[in-house]
Design a protein with these regions (language model features):
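Intrinsic-disorder/low-complexity, polar/charged segments enriched in Ser/Thr/Lys/Arg/Asp/Glu/Gln
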Residues: 71-73, 121-125, 160-162
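Secreted, periplasmic, or luminal enzymes acting at the cell surface/secretory milieu
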Residues: 1, 5-87, 93, 150-154, ...
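Terminal connector regions
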Residues: 129-168
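Short acidic, flexible loop segments centered on an aromatic residue
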Residues: 83-100, 106-108
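Extracellular/lumenal ectodomain signal focusing on beta-strand-rich modules
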Residues: 53, 58, 110-113, 132, ...
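Intrinsically disordered, low-complexity Pro/Gly/Ser/Thr-rich segments with frequent PxxP/GP/PP motifs
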Residues: 100-136
């Protein structure tokens, strides 16, 4: 087998700022407003290279409202659109849109490594339970709060498809 015949794909577990300092040089004055200066990562969390390409279909939810003692299923069709066989790490992120305390914009809650032959498609399924939505509040109680959530599935933290559901 040649080098290009063997499929290799690795994901990075962190992201790199586009500029190594995270902020531009202050010309003609001193600047310490790092938080106000927009920077995009050069490589987002979960980014990886591949010898092939993949396409994600839209997310379908079996319901858009989930009770505290229930669950819901999120599905997406993944297609290998390239000319080579390959593996893809399908990543699940969840965002709590309104919470008692500040929550991450995207929180990795699951992933699946899927191998597809060139041209092959497969339905990828994630089961969402209230346990995936829990966090420690200010009183150190492990809780899932009712409200709206964004569910994101994609190839890395920036290239995702989004669906919304409500926990009640």
């Amino acid at each position: 087998r040649g080098l290009g015949d063997v499929y290799k794909r690795q994901q990075i577990p962190l992201y790199y700022q586009y500029k190594s300092t995270g902020r531009p040089t202050a010309l003609g004055g001193w600047c310490a407003k790092y938080i106000d200066i927009p920077t995009e990562p050069a490589y987002p969390f979960g980014y990886g290279l591949s010898y092939t390409t993949f396409n994600y279909g839209d997310i379908t939810l079996d319901r858009t409202s989930m009770p505290m003692d229930g669950s819901l299923t999120a599905k997406v069709i993944l297609t290998n659109t390239g000319s080579r066989d390959g593996a893809e790490v399908v990543q699940l992120y969840i965002r709590d849109k309104v919470a008692e305390s500040t929550r991450p914009v995207k929180e990795l809650k699951g992933f699946q490594k899927v191998f597809l032959k060139a041209g092959e498609s497969r339905e990828i399924t994630f089961k969402i339970t209230p346990d995936l939505l829990k966090y420690y509040n200010y009183e150190l109680q492990y809780v899932a709060e009712p409200g709206a959530f964004d569910l994101m599935i994609g190839t890395d933290s920036q290239h995702v498809k989004t669906a919304t559901f409500v926990l009640h």
